[in-house]
Curated annotation (Swiss-Prot):
Disulfide bonds: none annotated. Belongs to the RNA polymerase beta' chain family. The RNAP catalytic core consists of 2 alpha, 1 beta, 1 beta' and 1 omega subunit. When a sigma factor is associated with the core the holoenzyme is formed, which can initiate transcription. Keywords: DNA-directed RNA polymerase, Magnesium, Metal-binding, Nucleotidyltransferase, Transcription, Transferase, Zinc. Gene3D superfamilies: 1.10.132.30, 1.10.150.390, 1.10.1790.20, 1.10.40.90, 2.40.40.20, 2.40.50.100, RNA polymerase II, clamp domain, RNA polymerase Rpb1, domain 3. It comes from Sorangium cellulosum (strain So ce56) (Polyangium cellulosum (strain So ce56)). This is DNA-directed RNA polymerase subunit beta'. GO terms for cellular component: DNA-directed RNA polymerase complex. Binds 1 Mg(2+) ion per subunit. Its cofactor is Mg(2+); Zn(2+). GO terms for biological process: DNA-templated transcription. Zn(2+) 1 binds at residues 70, 72, 85, 88. Zn(2+) 2 binds at residues 838, 912, 919, 922.
Length: 1427
């Protein structure tokens, strides 16, 4: 009886284990797993199709082919369960055991496991201290190895050639030493290894080692030896004497028709191993000659290598069709491997897909599901209901009934579907909003209807996109779909916290049209219509003024007033929190506002508490977004959803009524275009003339011409927009004319944000402008025509470059972006909110973000939704505005900005002290929900998606412009004041020339504008060589010029007046006369010289004595070394004054900056790569001096100063800067730690070393944000911080102390801290480590979980490493749990929630609300633990 029960028992629940361990298998273990030895290479009998005995498919070893039936057919049926047939030896049992029973092959000679041999570093090699090359020689039978030298004077592990071996045998005899070749020799040596002794020996050697290289080598060996010591693995297990054989159903052999077979490659590989093994056994029995046996051994080793990892060593073994055979390693690796194909991505049942069409009448939580599709998807539910209702008695008849599509079936389908959410998904699913839940509504036809407002989240359009539908089956799944995934609960974007259900396209157009005002319409407000009679009684009435909003509606419905008429109306006054203001009698206060009829109609759909002001403006896309945002902040979910739906209906309705269409005449070409083009042409000619006279270089000419055309194109565009955007309106009553914003359809579309941009209209009606070559440079002759005038053949040809490049880029970059997302997800997957508060006392300082004096992001935007670390105090009154550890919500941010606070210290993920995961307070607000984050939220994955998703968007965005060269940020060449105040110079050295111009002579100067109270209003860095327009202490007004400079070249200025003398400027060696073909003029350019002692320079001599002049305030001489590529401006023998330019270093010509620069840049930052030609930065604060040059490199010395002003010479640091690089500092400059000494991009690892983790993370966040900002993509800083936190998880051990670490070992921070705590408790000396920045790929591969790392990249390497260390995976991350088939430990799968018991009392509720109630942040969940 018990057998019957055990037969029906469920498979092992994945929850029943808590960790998984990987280690090496000993030969005994393999034999223990095995159900028998495979002795023959035969598979199945090709006539009977029965497996051959002792072959690869043997039924005796692996189990029966048919359920409960032995091979010879003596025992059939269930009643003989568990009997072993005496005739054919097959156990009578279910055939599925053929999926789990292993066999084995006993090898005639030990072979090396290729993973431990070839996977670098070679573990066997490390264990025995033999190089891989020598090891292979021994294993592949090409040399002998000394196993035990005894008293011969040889060394253990020496290689001997054949002749030498024979010679030694003659000399000593075979009992005086032992040597061997092949697997046996290596196995013997590994057996002799004493792991503990070896570890001790290596540690002693390391202490004694002098050279760094030797220490590193010993540390590597020690690592492997330690791994074996701690894991309990034996070194000899890296050699195989027994090989396990995979269960046959995992490497099937399927007969095809026509007597052929389809087979798994593994069978071929096993067959080779068995054949060679049997042959070797036979040869050994026959005592064959040594050379034949050697050859056979080598072949066996090669066969086993191919089975484990084909192609790793030697030639790849190919099948009959010249295709490489897939080995066991290939089964795991890559996108098609076991991990990514079957464990991380599975196909699901109960799903369908179809084309989507727009559903303009759906509510936000609905989607239209075709009837036929629904019938198929909900079949089991329908069968169940049909039986319940008694329509049918069996499933079979239910099936028939459904197939006939009887009317009862449709009624039941309606019932089953109501309140049962389905999931819609559109590929590619780039962020979590790519899958959302909707309630299905049955529709005719075959296409799925989708609500237009969720298109932005899915990135869907209706040009043929397809979407998939999935049905959540269990009650729990349905509940999660409804509460967490319903489209109505995903109103805000998790990336930025802004609404994502913004109206787009027609809806925007309709609402914009409805809320525009048109002068002199029927029923407009007119102040001049009121006349008084002689008795002072009013005659007539005031037109266009209304007592209430309802009155306006009535007038409009009766045709008294037009939609666009400007009117006045009384409205209630509402405060910021959405409450109406009352007067002393308790009545609502009202006021009269100017508005239009359309705006009043729109205001009718606003929820109570949203002020009329939000509807009382022309509603373009931005205003609508703001309106939804405000509605969400005041009313939360339900009202916002209703508002969005109402706006959708109104928008479509008005767009239809407006009947907007476009034609050629709407593209008005500005009359000024001709004039402007003429002017530009003249300017270009002027520049060319300057070039021909030799005043400017070819590069400068190119830059200037491109600049001229870029600005002319902008001017023509401005003219055109002005022309399209304005029209003349005539008042029919008085005949007066007035110029008003126009209703030109093209203008309306762009202005409202519905479709198109200034960029595109400019191509239609102004000029196409500059285009880019395929190489990315800008062609200097622009396309002056526009599409209305039509392009000439040449112009059309130039245009095609851009268009083609756009398409090519898109294809390439989509892949890149997807890969970036994958790496980000992998590195951040285990960042989960695991506790409420970590109790940290550390945080980061945040101030407003400025660039080139312009505020890019105000302080409020940066701190919204974060948590304050300490009390925020008003600087003037000293009153505490916000207490520590409070979330900074909209109101708090407003009070901080009103108080004029410049910077706030907030808690950040970067400084969170939790060892695993992140705490809720350090993370702050959950952007997608708008309140504090819940415990269990998978913030790492959200961060990865938020960063990766726009990457793909951006890559796809390039080709819409059609390749018009949108020049990236052209660097500014001047600085204007933005506020009124007094100019102050800080740390700036200024030289006044004879003509009165002031030149900035140093690099770290700043110019500040202060107001009356002495508060700093703005401050900017001054560029070296800039010409100041305002002196220190001068007053300035907004818009006045403070300084200007040349943005195309960096000058080298002289600090003293004197005669120019060239040094080492030898024609053809260090300087070249670049002759300009066009102008015939030459210009000296410094080139790289081969000689080490040549140092091109310019010195300044005293005109009288001829001696080299000294620099001001120093003993150094006025010599200026010239970097490679510098253009020399001064002539030898000229008398020049201080502050003049003697040479220029040209900057690169501007290339088009689109996200091409962007994506690789983001990847480069996240991978923490060293940029090429990176800047050398100073590690300390101090004063600069120059030392003697060494090996053609310049020596810069920085000497620190003590607080009382003494130079600390013994702590000085020296830096060598390569010749030909431009040094940014001058002798005598004071530099701070982290300042660059030469130009070039900074190296993130240097920043970390010099300035620490906080500075580095601030820099990284800013650099990454810059790329996204350029594209107008908003991502919250905290997402990037989460990723940076994961990159900074590890430390590098510098000194080991009394811990078990090795020098230079990389360990997780929390393991390091834990180990140190243990050592300190014992009274030992702790280890010292330095922070380490890992790129995201490196960081993912070095996670604690080997399952997660191996499913990411380099599978074999990770598994090899893990097996040797005997690693245990505690299944803490998300990925490991998905692979093991468990619930992920995040969200509702959090261990804390698993123990929750839900008790239901009373009757079930008939109707569940479709909007999920949101847990208030105040109410904390109390868990009921089951005891």
């Amino acid at each position: 009886m018990r057998d019957i029960f055990s037969f029906f028992e469920k498979p092992k629940d994945p929850l029943s284990f808590s960790a998984i361990r990987i280690s090496l298998a000993s030969p005994e273990k393999i034999r223990e797993w095995s159900h028998g030895e495979v002795k023959k290479p035969e598979t199945i009998n090709y006539r009977t199709f029965k497996p051959e005995r002792d072959g690869l498919f043997c039924a005796k070893i692996f189990g029966p082919v048919k359920d409960y039936e032995c091979n010879c057919g003596k025992y059939k049926r269930m009643k003989h369960r568990g009997i072993v047939c005496e005739k054919c030896g097959v156990e009578v049992i279910q055939s599925k055991v053929r999926r789990e029973r292993l066999g084995h092959i006993s090898l005639a000679t030990p072979v090396a496991h290729i993973w431990f041999l070839k996977s670098l570093p070679s573990r066997i090699g490390n264990m025995l201290d033999i190089t891989l090359k020598d090891l292979e020689k021994v294993l592949y039978c090409e040399a002998y190895i000394v196993i035990d030298p005894k008293e011969t004077g040889l060394m253990r592990g020496d290689l001997l050639s054949e002749e030498r071996y024979l010679q030694l045998l003659d000399e000593y005899g075979d009992d005086k030493f032992s040597a061997g070749m092949g697997g046996e020799a290596i196995l013997e040596m590994l057996k002799q290894v004493d792991v503990h002794g070896l570890a001790e020996l290596l540690r002693t050697e390391m202490r004694a080692a002098t050279s760094e290289a030797k220490r590193k080598k010993l540390a590597k060996r020690l690592k492997v030896v330690e791994a074996f010591r701690e894991s309990g693995n034996r070194p000899e297990w890296m050699m195989l004497t027994v090989i396990p054989v995979l269960p046959p159903d995992l490497r099937p052999l399927v007969p095809l028709d026509g007597g052929r077979f389809a087979t798994s490659d593994l069978n071929d590989l096993y067959r080779r191993v068995i054949n060679r093994n049997n042959r070797l056994k036979r040869l050994l029995e026959l005592n064959a000659p040594e050379i034949i046996i050697r050859n056979e051994r080598r072949m066996l080793q090669e066969a086993v290598d191919a089975l484990f990892d084909n192609g790793r060593r030697g030639k790849t073994i190919t099948g009959p069709n010249k295709r490489p055979l897939k080995s066991l390693s290939d089964m795991l690796k890559g996108k098609q491997g076991r991990f990514r194909q079957n464990l991380l991505g599975k196909r699901v049942d109960y799903s369908g897909r179809s084309v989507i069409v727009v559903g303009p009448t759906l509510r936000l939580h609905q989607c239209g599901l075709p009837k036929k599709m629904a019938l198929e998807l909900f079949k089991p539910f329908i069968y169940n209901k049909l039986e319940e209702r008694g329509y049918v008695n069996t499933i079979k008849s239910a099936k028939k009934m459904v197939e006939k599509e009887r009317p009862e079936v449709w009624d039941i389908l309606e019932e089953v579907i109501s309140e049962h959410p389905v999931l819609l998904n559109r590929a590619p699913t780039l962020h979590r909003l790519g899958i959302q839940a909707f309630e299905p509504v049955l529709i005719e036809g075959k296409a799925i209807q989708l609500h237009p407002l969720v298109c932005a989240a899915f990135n869907a359009d209706f040009d043929g996109d397809q979407m998939a539908v999935h049905v959540p089956l269990s009650v729990e799944a349905q509940m999660e779909a409804r509460v967490l995934m319903m489209s109505t609960n995903n109103i805000l974007s998790p990336a930025s916290g802004k609404p994502i259900i913004n109206p787009t396209q027609d809806i925007v157009l309709g609402l914009y049209y409805a809320t525009r005002e048109r002068k002199f319409e029927k029923g407009s407000y007119r102040a001049d219509t009121l006349a008084f009679g002689e008795d002072g009684v009013a005659q007539g009435y005031l037109r266009g003024i209304y007592a209430s909003l309802e009155e306006v509606r009535m007038a409009y419905d009766n045709g008294e007033v037009a939609l666009h008429a400007g009117i006045r109306v009384r409205v209630p006054i509402i405060d910021d929190d959405g409450n109406p203001q009352l007067d002393e009698f308790g009545h609502v206060k009202r006021r009269i506002v100017e508005t239009t009829v359309g705006r009043v109609i729109i205001s009718e759909v606003l929820p109570k508490g949203v002020a009329f002001e939000y509807a009382n403006k022309t509603l373009d896309k931005k205003a609508l977004s703001a309106l939804i945002d405000v509605c969400y902040r005041i009313h939360r979910n339900k009202e916002t959803v209703l508002l969005a739906d109402r706006l959708r209906t109104l928008g479509f309705d008005h767009a239809m009524r407006a009947g907007i269409s476009i034609c050629m005449d709407h593209m008005v070409i500005p009359p000024a275009k001709k004039v402007l083009l003429g002017e530009a042409q003249k300017e270009v000619e002027r520049v060319v003339e300057q070039y021909q006279e030799g005043l400017i270089t070819d590069g400068e000419r190119y830059n200037k011409i491109v600049d001229i055309w870029a600005s002319i194109a902008d001017q023509v565009t401005t003219e055109m927009m002005a022309g399209i955007g304005k029209e003349t309106v005539v008042d029919h009553e008085t005949g007066k004319e007035s110029i008003e914003p126009s209703f030109n359809p093209i203008y309306i579309m762009a202005d409202s944000g519905a479709r198109g941009s200034t960029q595109q209209i400019r191509q239609l009606a102004a000029m196409r402008g500059l285009m880019a070559k395929p190489s990315g440079e800008i062609i200097e002759t622009p396309i002056t025509a526009n599409f209305r005038e039509g392009l000439s053949v040449l112009q059309y040809f130039i245009s095609t470059h851009g268009a083609r490049k756009g398409l090519a880029d898109t294809a390439l970059k989509t892949a890149n972006s997807g890969y970036l997302t994958r790496r980000l997800v992998d590195v951040a997957q285990d960042a989960v909110i695991s506790e409420f508060d970590c109790g940290t006392l550390d945080g980061i300082r945040v101030a407003k973000l400025e660039e080139a004096g312009e505020v890019i992001q105000p302080l409020g935007d940066r701190i919204l939704g974060r948590v304050a670390l300490e009390d925020v105090v008003d600087p003037l009154t000293g009153e505490v505005l916000i207490t520590a550890n409070t979330e900074l919500d909209e109101q708090a941010v407003r009070s901080i900005e009103d108080a004029g606070i410049e910077e706030v210290v907030i808690r950040s993920v970067l400084t969170c002290q939790l060892r695993r995961g992140v705490c809720a307070l350090c993370y702050g607000r959950d952007l997608a929900r708008g309140y504090r984050v819940n415990i269990g939220e998978a913030v790492g994955i959200i961060a990865a998606q938020s960063i990766g998703e726009p990457g793909t968007q951006l890559t796809m965005r390039t080709f819409h412009i059609g390749g018009t060269a949108a020049r990236g940020k052209i660097e500014a060449s001047y600085l204007e004041a933005r506020t009124e105040g007094t100019v102050r110079l800080r740390r700036a050295v200024v030289q006044k020339k004879k003509d009165g111009t002031m030149v900035v002579m140093n690099r770290h100067g700043e110019i500040v504008v202060v107001d009356e109270t002495g508060r700093e209003r703005e401050h900017n860095r001054l560029v070296y060589g800039a010409i100041l327009k305002k002196a220190d202490g001068e007053r300035t007004k907004p818009g006045e010029l403070l300084a200007e400079w040349d943005q195309f070249a960096t000058p080298i200025l002289t600090e003293v007046s004197g005669v120019v003398k060239f040094g080492d400027l030898i024609e053809g060696v260090s300087v070249q006369d670049r002759l300009d073909e066009v102008t015939g003029l030459s210009r000296k350019v410094v080139i790289e010289s081969k000689a080490a002692d040549v140092r091109p320079r310019i010195s300044l001599k005293d005109p009288e004595s001829g001696k080299t002049l000294k620099l001001p305030n120093s003993e150094l001489e006025a010599r200026y070394l010239l970097p490679v590529g510098a253009h020399i401006v001064a002539q030898e023998g000229d008398l020049i004054e201080a502050g003049e330019v003697i040479a220029k270093i040209p900057r690169d010509t501007t290339k088009v900056q689109d996200i091409t620069g962007g994506l690789p840049r983001v990847a480069e930052l996240f991978e923490a790569r060293k940029p090429k030609d990176h800047a050398i930065i100073s590690e300390i604060d101090g004063e600069v001096t120059f030392g003697k040059d060494t090996k053609g490199k310049r020596k810069v010395i920085i000497t620190p100063y003590s607080p009382d002003g003494h130079a600390l010479g013994d702590q000085a640091r020296e830096y060598l800067i390569p010749k030909g690089k431009h040094i940014q500092v001058q002798p005598g400059d004071r530099v701070r730690a982290g300042d660059p000494l030469q130009d070039g991009p900074p190296n993130p690892h240097d920043i970390l070393r010099v300035k620490g983790e906080k500075e580095l993370s601030a820099w990284l966040v800013n650099e990454i944000q810059q790329v996204y900002r350029l594209q107008g993509v908003g991502i919250n800083d905290k997402h990037i911080e989460v990723i940076v936190r994961q990159m900074l998880r590890r430390v590098r051990v510098r000194e080991v102390g009394d811990t078990n670490f090795l020098v230079d070992e990389q360990v997780e921070k929390h393991i390091f801290e834990k180990e140190n705590e243990t050592v300190l408790e014992r009274g030992g000396k702790p280890a010292i480590a330095e922070a380490l920045l890992l790129g995201i790929t490196k960081a993912s591969l070095s996670t604690e979980s080997f399952i997660s790392a191996s499913s990411f990249q380099e599978t074999t390497k990770v598994l090899t490493e893990a097996a040797i260390n005997g690693k245990t995976d505690d299944l803490r991350g998300l990925k490991e749990n998905v692979i093991m088939g468990r619930l992920i430990p995040a969200g509702t799968g959090l261990p804390a929630y698993k123990r929750l018991q839900v008790v239901v009392e009373g009757e079930p509720v008939a109707q569940a609300p479709y909007v999920a109630p949101r847990p208030r942040p105040e109410e904390t969940l109390t868990a009921v633990n089951e005891e």
